[in-house]
A protein has these predicted regions:
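Beta1/beta-strand and adjacent pyrophosphate-binding region of the FAD-binding site
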Residues: 1-15
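Conserved N-terminal helical subregion
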Residues: 2-3, 54, 67, 72-157, ...
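Glycine-rich FAD pyrophosphate-binding loop
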Residues: 8, 12, 21-44
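Conserved Rossmann-like nucleotide-cofactor binding loop
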Residues: 15, 38, 151
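N-terminal FAD cofactor-binding segment of flavoenzymes
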Residues: 36-73
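FAD/FMN-dependent oxidoreductases across multiple families
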Residues: 119-122, 138, 217-298, 302-306, ...
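Conserved FAD-binding catalytic core of PHBH/FMO-like flavoproteins
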Residues: 151-227, 231
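C-terminal helical "tail/cap" subdomain of flavin- and related membrane-associated enzymes
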Residues: 296-387
């Protein structure tokens, strides 16, 4: 038997859960599909920036595992500078808990039905709606939000986002002794300059550390070199006793400028749409925002009698892509001038303050570029793709 909904959302990450919540609050009967049983582990550093809380309109401090304001900035696994934070920068979560919390908010609307442990096999979309097939059931809806990640079946079924830049990264969850955990209780670390185009991080969680390395470029470093850097970075940051709980590799997807993320009434959001901030590697904020925009576009289209084309893609291009494109320009500055990217914040509290405001969402890259005058306008000439 085929069941019909106002909307189907595939994926229970931030984009999907937030879209489902917004649709539910608007009174739309929504089906939320997830291929795994919840709660489920999710590959992600788990740093949720302050601007995510702003986008959600809630204080995340009570539900966060840790709230971080201080950053240790490292240069080539040698020199370091501690950047004390006057304001919180990042909330630390395990994604299994954060995503489950967002799903609970969606279910609390009373309009969202969750079916987890149900993998999508195929999707069809036309001007009248969408059909989603799983191994067990077939579902129909007026609209579909594909928020099923970088390798999800929705984009593949629709022929969307098959050509995009994929930035490689690897992370480990590390168990350490109580003394080491205490050292990291209020701070995170970033390493730059050690390997061309790459960076490392340490994010403290409630009972372990998340340690990883990533790369800004799709072709600058072979996988072996990134893996070797990861080993050196781990040994440098955690020289004492430790136990590796989990090691996993992943990629950060970047939407090519102008690439379609919509087919009829089927939309892509979050990582599925390649909405990731290249300079910081942040995806959660953009997932939340795209989920909100997707839901609002659907509600508005319905309110207008479902006439004309759904304008989700135009809204993403107007609201999110300018900042994401500017972030790629800043990432290219790091590729070419890594030393300056360490020295400027390390030596100038004012510059570090500007960076912190970008992370917090109080400023964006365009604002900072304008404040730099003629020097900032040089960024207009930088590439907007990372390949």
């Amino acid at each position: 038997m085929t069941v019909r909904y106002d909307a189907i959302v595939v994926g229970t990450g931030p984009a999907g859960a937030v879209a489902a919540e917004a649709l539910g609050r608007a009174g739309r009967r929504t089906l939320l599909l997830e291929r795994e049983r919840l709660p489920r582990a999710k590959t992600c550093g788990g740093g949720v920036t302050w601007k995510v809380a702003q986008a959600l309109g809630v204080d995340l401090t009570p539900v966060a595992e840790r709230t971080i304001g201080t950053v240790e900035l490292h240069w080539r696994l040698k020199a370091s500078k501690t950047m004390p934070g006057r304001e919180p920068l990042v909330h630390m979560f395990q994604r299994s808990r954060f995503d489950a919390w967002l799903v609970e908010r969606a279910l609390a609307t009373g309009q969202v039905e969750l079916k987890d442990g149900l993998a999508v096999k195929s999707v069809e979309a036309d001007a009248r709606g969408v059909t989603v097939r799983t191994a067990q059931d077939t579902f129909e809806a007026d609209y579909l939000v594909g928020a099923d990640g970088v390798a999800g079946p929705v984009a593949r079924s629709l022929g969307l986002m098959q050509e995009r830049d994929l930035l490689p990264a690897t992370e480990q969850d590390i168990a350490v002794d109580a003394k080491t955990m205490d050292r990291w209780h209020d701070r995170m670390a970033l390493d730059i300059g050690t390997l061309y185009g790459s960076y490392g991080w340490v994010f403290p969680k409630e009972d372990h550390l998340n340690v990883g390395v990533g790369c800004f470029s799709t072709n600058s470093r072979p996988a072996k070199q990134l893996k070797d850097y990861g080993k050196r970075h781990l040994a440098y940051q955690l020289p004492g006793p430790m136990r590796v709980l989990r090691t996993v590799g992943f990629v950060l997807p970047l939407r090519p400028v102008g690439a379609p993320i919509q087919r009829g009434r089927a939309l892509l959001a979050g990582d599925a749409a390649g909405l990731v901030e290249a300079f910081t590697g942040e995806g959660i904020h953009w997932a939340v925002r795209s989920g909100q925009i997707a839901a609002q576009a659907i509600v508005d289209h319905q309110m207008q009698g479902a006439r004309g084309e759904l304008d989700y893609e135009r809204r993403i291009d107007a609201a999110l892509m300018p900042t994401l494109v500017d972030a790629r320009r800043w990432a290219h500055i790091y590729l070419w001038l890594p030393r300056a990217c360490y020295a400027l914040p390390a030596r100038s509290p004012r510059f570090w303050g500007a960076v912190a405001k970008i992370v917090r969402g109080e400023r964006d890259y365009t604002d900072v570029r304008q404040r730099l005058g003629a020097f900032g306008r040089l960024a207009d000439w930088l590439p907007v793709e990372m390949g």
